[in-house]
Amino acid sequence: MSPEELKQLELLRNRFAQLTSNLGSLRTSVSNSNPLPTYESLQASVNILQANIRSIQDIATENAGLFQRLAIHPSTNFPGRTQEHILTQLLRKKLEPNVESWVEEARATARGVGVDASKLAGGVHRRGEHDYDDEGTYGMDEDGDDAPQDPFSEQWADMLDNFQQTLQQYVTVQVKKKYTAEERAAGIENVRTGLRQTLEESEDDDEDEEEEEEDEEEDEAAAAAGNAGGLATGAGGSAAAGGGMFGAIEPEHIFYLQAQGNLQLPGNVPIESKRIQTVPTRRVAPPR
C-alpha cells in the first residue's frame, strides 16, 4: 500500500470511530436523561450522525477500488487468543445472520416493486457514475438517456407524485371538513366532539355564521360609539340632574367603558361612591 492509500484507510477508520462515539453519546443521553432531551437537542444529534455517515459514504465512494482489493491478514503480534472475537469479526467474509435477513428482505421488496435486484449488488458507485454531475444538478443533462439510471429513480418519482397528490387533496378538500370519511359514514350525529354546540357540515351555514359575527361586531362598535357620544354630550346635563338611564356617571362607568365598550355595569361591580361608610365606634375610656 502506498502512503496515500494508507492515509485514506486511516481516515475511514477515524470516521467510523467518530460515528461509534456519537451513537454511544446519543444512546447514553436518551437512556439517562430525565426528562428526555429536547427536540432541538435530538435534531442536532441526528444532523451530526447524518454528517458522519455522509462523510463515510464519500470516502468509500472515492476509494471503492482500493477497499475492494484489500485483503486483511492479522499480524504475528496480534493477541489472537485473548481477542479472538474481535479477530473473528474482522475476518468474517459473510454477513451476520440478522444483517443477511435484512438484505434478503430488501431484495424481496425490490423484486416486488419491479426492480432488478442484480443491479443493486453492483457495489459502491464511483463518483460521476450517477445521473447527476459533480455540480449537484440531478437529472438535468440533455443526454440523460445514455447515462446509467438509478434503479430506484422511477419508484422515487412515483412516490413523489403520490405524495404531492395526497397533500393537495388534503389541503384543498379534507382540511376544510369537520369530520373524517369514517365519521361521516357512521353518521355525524354519533360523533363525540366534547363540544356542546351543534356542528354542521354545510358550507352555507359557515358563511352565515361568519356574516352574523360580522354583524354583531358592527352592532357592538355602533353601540360603543353611541355610548361614548352620549357620555360626551350628556355628562353635564343628565348626569348633573341625576336622571337618565345610568344616573350619575361614576369612575367605574368610565373604566368599564374603556375595557368593554359599554356603560352598562354588571350588578356585581361595586361603586365606590355608593358604598355605605361605616363610622368606627369609639370605646369609652373607663373612669380613673
Curated annotation (Swiss-Prot):
It is found in: Nucleus. Keywords: Activator, Coiled coil, Nucleus, Transcription, Transcription regulation. Its main location: nucleus. Signal peptide: none annotated. Residues 122-150, 191-245, 266-288 are annotated as: Disordered. GO terms for cellular component: core mediator complex; mediator complex. It holds the Pfam family Med8. It comes from the Eukaryota. Residues 4-58, 180-228 form a coiled coil. GO terms for biological process: regulation of transcription by RNA polymerase II. The keyword Nucleus applies. GO terms for molecular function: RNA polymerase II cis-regulatory region sequence-specific DNA binding; transcription coregulator activity. Disulfide bonds: none annotated. The keyword Cell division does not apply. Belongs to the Mediator complex subunit 8 family. Component of the Mediator complex. This is Mediator of RNA polymerase II transcription subunit 8. The lineage of its organism: Eukaryota, Fungi, Dikarya, Ascomycota, Pezizomycotina.
